[in-house]
Every structure is written in C-alpha cells, then in structure tokens.
Curated annotation (Swiss-Prot):
Binding site for Mg(2+): 265
Gene responsible for this protein: pheS
Keyword Transcription attributed: no
Name of the molecule in the record: Phenylalanine--tRNA ligase alpha subunit
Quaternary assembly: Tetramer of two alpha and two beta subunits.
Species this protein is from: Wolbachia pipientis subsp. Culex pipiens (strain wPip)
Compartment(s): Cytoplasm
Family annotation (InterPro entries): aa-tRNA-synth_II, aa-tRNA-synth_II/BPL/LPL, Phe-tRNA-synth_IIc_asu, Phe-tRNA_ligase_II_N, Phe_tRNA_ligase_alpha1_bac, Phenylalanyl-tRNA_Synthase, tRNA-bd_arm
C-alpha cells in the first residue's frame, strides 16, 4: 500500500499541474482546488491513509512527501489565480474603455451672484484706499442703531411701520433688525481708540418696505474714516475715486447735494450721470456729527471724520442694467445664468 502511494504521487502531481494550467476561469480553478485540497480532496485522503501505517519512520517520510505535494499544488493554484485575476481586469478595462475622441458633455458650472460680485469689488476698491473690512451683528439694540447715531426717539425711522422690532429684549434692551450698517461704525469706535480709524462694513440691512425698488432685506456697505483734521474735501475725493473706479469711468459726472442725516453734519447725497443717463442717487454721506463722537467717547474737538453708506443693490442695478430690485432674490436659474459671473471674477 505504501509503495502504491509513493508511485501515485508523481502521477497525481502531473495531473494536478495539467488541470491547473487548463483552468479557464476562477470558477474552474476553484473546482480544481476543492478536488485536491478540499476536505474531501485527494490530498486529504492521502493524509487519512497515513493512519493505517504502523511504522512511525515510514509514516513520517510519507507524510513529508504528501506535504510537499500539497504545498506545490497550493502554490500553483495561487499563481494561476493571480494570472486569471489579471486577465479579468485587463478584459474589463478593455470592454469599459472610454473613447476619448467622443465629444464631451458640457459641464454646468454655477455662477457668482451679482451682489456677491459687487460686494467683493467694492471691498477691494476700498482696501486699495486703506480701508479695513469689519463686520457687525444683524440683530442690534436700539442704542447702536438709533441712539448712538443721534436719532431721537420721535424720529420716523424708529416707528414700527419702518423698522422690524423683535419681541424679546436682551439685557432689558429693545432689539431690532438693523436698518443700516452704520451700527458697525458705532461698535468700531466704542472699542477702538487708536487713530486713524478707517473701516468699511458690508452686510444685510432690513426695512419694512417692498416694491420694485425696495425689498425688506437688502445690502449696504458703510464707510468710516476718523482722524485729526479730516475734512469734507477728503470725503469728496474718496467718493469720487471709488465711483470712478467702480463704474470704470474716470470722467464720470458726480454731484453732491445738501441733505440731512441725524448722524452726519454737514450731510450730502451723491448722484451720478452714468452712460449719459439722468442724475441718479447712489449714496449718502457726511461729516460725523459731534454727538455721535460724544456717544462713543471720542473727543470731537480733537478728532473729526466722515462716513458714507452705499446701497449694494443700487450699484448692481446701475452697473449691470437690472431694472427690478426684486429679481435679485427670485432664485431663477435663467436670470442668474444671464447676470451671473464666472467664479474666477470674484476677488
């Protein structure tokens, strides 16, 4: 019996090698593996036959021969398995290959909203003039929105028909949705006593109004410059430089009209004649009122300053010829595709 086992092993090895080489798929190879190395396979049967050998030395030697056979078959199967897997991957890649000569489908890319574009551009222009961008809260107390800005309690702007008041008070203070970004200049002057103070603040503001030229929420950018000997001439120069740069017209016609704002004295409204159109108001400005300086603890006899407030929507409507303010917030993709900008234009 032992001699028969030894004589069968080379024949079995040749047969196993042939079947492994001829396996055309991983499924076929698995059948070969089970027939030789499985629990009911030929090699397992050989190991079981060792139990019938009494001589320990003979059993050991024959077991070593069978073990060599098992390891060789296992190595051949592993090698063949890797070969078949590589072949499957190559075949899959070949069948799934992309024809690079086919025309590509156009990729849809989102666009920058005109308001985002204008805010970015305005900030950049003022940054080149030395203004630092700052932020402030949308929900404010009455002091920062009205009282500190020299707006008396009987002023029409403080009535509920014009201003959104919140029901809950904070620290016993009546809260509002800010009606202008001027509240940011108050907060800046309260905490900053090093001069010069030169800031711009862009953000959302809220007023109870809705028509073709007004929305309950819109955007402003506030500017403030405080130092010794600041004068109206510097204000006019700053506004002129900004508007000329923004509209890309060094010869832009600009005029200042006397006006009134509680927080500036003197005050002015600025009009432009853009693309040979009639005069159009674009912003309000003026010299910071002495009472405003008193309310934030700045010596108005030593320091002076100017401030201005610009409607972002108004600038965008003029520059890009948008007729209805409400269209900024309609969320129409067709409108944004027409008036929007490529992301690379946002700086």
């Amino acid at each position: 019996m032992n001699k028969e086992l030894i004589s069968e092993i080379p024949l079995l090895e040749d047969k196993a090698v042939s079947e492994i080489e001829n396996a055309a798929s991983l499924k076929d190879l698995e059948k070969v593996r089970l027939s030789y190395l499985g629990r009911k396979g030929v090699v397992k049967a050989y190991f079981d036959d060792l139990k019938n050998i009494d001589d320990a030395g003979e059993k050991r030697d024959l077991g070593a021969v069978i073990n060599v056979l098992r390891n060789k078959i296992d190595q051949l199967i592993t090698s063949k398995e890797n070969e078949l897997k590589d072949k499957e991957v190559k075949l899959k890649l070949q069948n799934e290959a992309v024809d690079i000569t086919l025309p590509v489908r156009p990729e849809r890319i989102g666009k920058i909203h005109p308001l985002s574009k204008v805010i970015s551009e305005v900030k950049l222009i003022f940054a080149h003039m030395g203004f630092k961008a700052v932020d402030g809260p949308d929900i404010e107390d009455e002091f920062h929105v009205f009282d500190a800005l020299n707006t008396p309690s009987h002023h029409p702007a403080r009535e509920e028909q014009d201003t959104f008041y919140l029901r809950n008070k904070i620290n016993d203070k009546r809260m509002v949705l800010r009606t202008h970004t001027s509240s940011v200049q108050i907060r800046t002057m309260e905490k900053t006593k090093t001069f010069p103070i030169k800031i711009v603040a862009a953000g959302r503001v809220y007023r109870n109004d809705f028509d073709a030229t007004h929305t309950p929420m819109f955007h402003q950018i506030e500017g403030l410059y405080v130092n010794e000997n600041v004068n109206m001439g510097q204000l006019k120069f700053t506004i002129h430089c900004f508007l000329s740069k923004f509209f890309g017209d060094k010869g832009l016609r600009i005029r200042f009209r006397n006006s009134f704002f509680p927080f500036t004295e003197p005050s002015a409204e600025v009009d432009i004649s853009y693309k040979d159109s009639k005069w159009i108001e674009v912003l309000g400005c003026g010299m910071v009122h002495p009472n405003v300086f008193k309310n934030v603890g700045i010596d108005h006899t030593k320091y002076s300053g100017f401030a201005f407030g610009i409607g972002i929507e108004r600038l965008a409507m003029l520059k890009y010829q948008i007729s209805d303010l409400r269209s900024f917030y309609d969320n129409r993709v067709s409108w944004l595709n027409h008036y929007g900008f490529h992301f690379s234009s946002l700086r």
